[in-house]
């Protein structure tokens, strides 16, 4: 693994892109201070330049290289970074002039986090510069949670994939923007649900979900995202589903229990569970993109997804299912 890490650092220093493991999903990494390298991320992913990238720092001390921390949120930010960094929380802050406009899609702000994955962080530290890294897949497709999934998406397009096994979280980081309030707890504008839940954030402030505007303010806000090639549809209740004669349907189930109302409502070609039998949201999140990719390769006419409870990690899972089903 050390040899792969050294090779990754050398390629990043040369202005190349490499796929790296994080605790959330595999990321396509480039030196965030090298605009030509960042441009290779957009090219490899076929990503539009209006969709900004998250910048990763090796240590909290590196934060002010990429972001300006307003005094009225400094205390709150310190609380959040102490509690959740290294980890899957991205905070949107005013950017420094050193961050290229290509990274932020011309915005005056930048999303920053410190990855909780030791290999990613070691490479980040060895590079000596912040790393820009969106998910290592073609734009709009299912995010990769394994090196083999990256290979299927970007094989032949990038020089190196560092394989560290499956990702521990399975969904992308939570993204927030902090709004200070005098004499009150701050408001956390939730731009993307993720592993750090609303309930965890409420210890430090009030959480409000953001509705996407005409201009993207952060990654993960596009209506259609995380989509398999097979037509994909989330149904909120069994009565919403009317099968067409002759079509082969697969069910993306929460637990896959035979007595469940979604499992019983149709003679499915395949039933694949996110959390087989147990109904654990953490397991469902880890398996989500893996299962979606698996079902995408089954030759189905359509994948039908049943909902999960929107508490804790369930909010992030439902966000991904809704965006995958948007056409």
Model-derived features with residue positions:
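Active-site-adjacent structural elements in enzyme catalytic cores
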Residues: 1-327
């Amino acid at each position: 693994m050390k040899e792969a890490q050294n090779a990754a650092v050398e390629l990043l220093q040369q202005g190349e892109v490499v796929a790296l493991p994080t605790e959330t999903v595999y990321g396509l990494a480039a030196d965030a201070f090298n605009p030509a390298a960042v441009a290779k991320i957009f090219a490899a992913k076929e990503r539009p330049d209006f969709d900004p990238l998250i910048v990763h720092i090796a240590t909290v001390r590196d934060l002010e290289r990429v972001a300006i921390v307003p005094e009225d949120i400094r205390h709150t930010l310190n609380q959040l970074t102490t509690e959740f960094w290294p980890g899957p929380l991205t905070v949107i802050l005013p950017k420094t002039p050193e961050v290229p406009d290509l990274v932020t899609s011309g915005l005056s702000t930048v999303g920053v986090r410190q990855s909780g994955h030791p290999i990613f962080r070691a490479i980040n530290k060895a590079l000596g510069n912040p790393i820009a890294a969106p998910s290592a897949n073609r734009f709009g497709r299912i995010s990769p949670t394994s090196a083999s999934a990256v290979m299927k998406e970007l094989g032949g397009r990038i020089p190196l994939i560092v394989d560290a096994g499956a990702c521990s979280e399975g969904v992308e980081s939570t993204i927030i923007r902090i709004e200070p309030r005098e004499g009150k707890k701050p408001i956390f504008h939730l731009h993307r649900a993720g592993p750090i839940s609303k309930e965890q954030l409420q210890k430090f402030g009030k959480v409000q979900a953001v509705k996407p505007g005409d201009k993207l303010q952060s990654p993960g806000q596009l209506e259609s995202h995380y989509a398999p090639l097979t037509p994909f549809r989330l149904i909120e209740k069994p009565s919403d589903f009317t099968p067409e004669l002759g079509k082969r349907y697969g069910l993306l189930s929460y637990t896959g229990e035979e007595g469940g109302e979604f499992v019983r409502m149709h003679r499915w070609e395949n039933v694949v569970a996110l959390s087989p039998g147990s109904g654990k949201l953490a397991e469902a999140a880890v398996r989500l993109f893996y299962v979606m990719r698996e079902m995408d390769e089954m030759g189905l006419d359509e994948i039908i997804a049943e909902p999960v409870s929107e508490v804790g990690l369930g909010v992030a899972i439902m966000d991904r299912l809704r965006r995958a089903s948007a056409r």
